[in-house]
Swiss-Prot record:
Pathway: Carbohydrate biosynthesis; gluconeogenesis; Carbohydrate degradation; glycolysis; D-glyceraldehyde 3-phosphate and glycerone phosphate from D-glucose: step 2/4. GO terms for biological process: gluconeogenesis; glucose 6-phosphate metabolic process; glycolytic process. The lineage of its organism: Bacteria, Pseudomonadati, Pseudomonadota, Betaproteobacteria, Neisseriales. This is Glucose-6-phosphate isomerase 2. It comes from Neisseria gonorrhoeae (strain ATCC 700825 / FA 1090). It catalyses: alpha-D-glucose 6-phosphate = beta-D-fructose 6-phosphate. The keyword Isomerase applies. GO terms for cellular component: cytosol.
Length: 547
């Protein structure tokens, strides 16, 4: 039996030996539990004391990480080794946020930092030219709106950042279009003036069908407004790894910005894919975002596992996913401006870790990626928190809470923070049947006994609390990088590749065939798919409006 398997079995035995210990009892027996089980990094505090484990558990989890060669895999990530084995690529998103003066970073034998610096500076300069009015629309009017057309990693990260940093927004309004459903683009275009709008087409391959369909629809919008092809091109820029394809689409080379084969889409907001963030908040704020992410990178690469925030986040996730058989995990930002964070995390975690094959192609040896969902607190308390508190499923929760409001401070911010703290405490402590009876002491005994079971809360429901002193570009960068590295560590322990996404491709492949077949002709599919296609054609014949 190898060392990793022994470490795994030790954790399984440990769970059986300790699963009866309640969190409320741990806190009662360990007055210093919070002091021992929280970490701070600049403006961030990570509290993991409300989890179903003790110091002995953490030691066993760290041993598991050691036997999985986490240290070696982290070194490979940092130094440009081809950690994305199925595609034969490095994953150098951390290089995108290195400060000036950093040591060389190599991919395929060449230092990538000069290229990173060049493209970042080009994108920042272009964003500044829009903001300053130096680059104007073809009719000489200032650009007032910037529309980013992308999907998946080219959309979720930038959209989340722009929303999160709304208080830092400058004068240009930034919009996002991702879905190929015509309503997605139409609801944006109806508010815009073609003379004062810049469109950015973001696609790593410049073959993404949803993105190109929307870009072509924008061209048609300009034609309908009387613009020539060259006049329309003046209102386009692009971000792609295939810069020649972007230029073939009609976008001038000086407005095509490079992204890189060695950065996956869901890790690309730090590259020129972050152009809408640069436009929204300015170059200085974007550099603060990069600096925050780099601060977390430095912490991750140079801090021992027991004090390492992303490593701890990952080990906790592995503990629940593999040894306590949790049914999922939820992330709840108690900040209106962070309301898109759960969608970004959903892609980051589930697209990265939703793998049934190990890195070498063999079947995965354990349960891998979990179901990640979430929503905006306090709203979630009036939705799915009932299941968290009294349901039969184990779903650990991350509470992400800025301490300072970004709006008017009139008591609502304090209310929001108080609710986050209260929910975490309620999940941990629960309410015993006797405590429920005591609350109902004024009722007749029969009524008290009838109601008390419904007011009992099992408790012992785990959570992490991630507190930010303020929601700033720097703190947002730290938060995002922490979750990126958490995802990497989980992949390292489960021995899956978190940087590919072959499962996304198969449906796209079938869709290419079905698109043509929807208009009629020969098709050979299963009976269900044929029936769905027949209903589509029926609706078209009746004038149902499908397109």
């Amino acid at each position: 039996m190898d060392a990793f398997t022994r470490a795994w079995y030790a954790l399984e035995r440990h769970y059986q030996d300790t699963c009866h210990i309640l969190l409320r009892d741990r806190f009662a027996a360990e007055p210093d539990r919070f002091e021992r089980m929280h970490e701070r990094l600049d403006g961030m505090l990570f509290d993991y004391s409300k989890n179903r484990f003790g110091e002995d558990t953490l030691q066993l989890l760290c041993r598991l990480a050691e036997t999985a060669d986490l240290e070696g895999k982290m070194r490979a990530l940092r130094t440009g080794a081809k950690v994305n084995g199925s595609e034969g690529r490095a994953a150098l998103h951390t290089a995108l946020r290195l400060p000036d003066g950093a040591d060389a970073v190599y991919a395929d034998g060449r230092d990538v930092l000069p290229e990173i610096r060049r493209e970042l500076n080009r994108a920042l300069k272009f964003a500044h030219s829009l903001d300053d009015g130096l680059y104007q629309g073809i009719t000489g009017k200032r650009i007032a709106d910037f529309v980013h057309i992308g999907i998946g990693g080219s959309d979720l990260g930038p959209a989340m950042c722009v929303q999160a940093l709304e208080p830092f927004r400058r004068q240009i309004s930034v919009h996002f279009v991702s879905n190929a459903d015509p309503a997605c683009l139409d609801e944006v275009l109806c508010r815009l003036n073609p003379e004062t709008t810049m469109f950015c087409v973001a696609s790593k391959s410049f073959k993404t069908p949803e993105t190109l369909l929307n870009a072509e629809a924008v061209k048609a919008w300009y034609r309908g407004a009387g613009f020539s092809e060259s006049e329309t091109a003046h209102h386009f820029c692009a971000v792609s790894a295939d810069t020649e394809a972007a230029q073939s689409f009609g976008i001038a080379a000086e407005r095509v910005f490079a992204m890189y084969d060695w950065v996956g889409g869901r890790y690309s907001v730090w590259s020129p894919v972050g152009l809408p963030v640069m436009v929204a908040v300015g170059g200085a704020r974007f550099r603060e975002l990069l600096a925050g992410a780099h601060a977390m990178d430095s912490h991750f690469f140079h801090t021992p596992p027991r004090r390492n925030i992303p490593v701890l986040m990952a080990l906790i996730a592995v503990w629940y996913n593999n040894f306590q058989h949790a049914d999922g995990q939820t992330a709840v930002p108690y900040s209106h401006n962070l309301r898109l964070l759960p969608a970004w995390l959903n892609q980051l975690d589930m697209e990265s870790l939703g793998k049934s094959r190990a890195s070498d192609g063999s079947p995965a040896a354990c349960k891998t990626g979990g179901i990640v969902f979430g929503g905006e607190g306090v709203n979630c308390q009036h939705a799915y928190f009932q299941l968290l508190h009294q349901g039969t499923r184990l779903i650990p929760c991350d509470f992400i809470v800025p301490m300072t409001a970004q709006g008017a401070e009139d008591g609502r911010s304090r209310f929001t923070v108080a609710n986050a703290f209260a929910q975490a405490e309620a999940l941990m402590k629960g309410k015993t049947l006797d405590e429920a009876r005591a609350e109902l002491a004024d009722l007749p005994e029969a009524e008290r006994e009838r109601l008390a079971p419904h007011k009992e809360f099992p408790g012992n429901r785990p959570s992490n609390s991630i507190l930010l002193d303020r929601l700033t570009p720097c703190n947002l960068g730290m938060l995002m990088a922490a979750y990126e590295h958490k995802t990497f560590v989980q992949g390292a322990i489960w021995n899956v590749n978190p940087f590919d996404q072959w499962g996304v491709e198969y449906g796209k492949q079938l869709a290419k065939t079905i698109i043509g077949e929807l208009e009629g002709g020969t098709s050979v599919h299963d009976a269900s798919t044929e029936g769905l296609m027949a209903f589509y054609r029926e609706c078209r014949l009746k004038g149902g409006g499908a397109a």
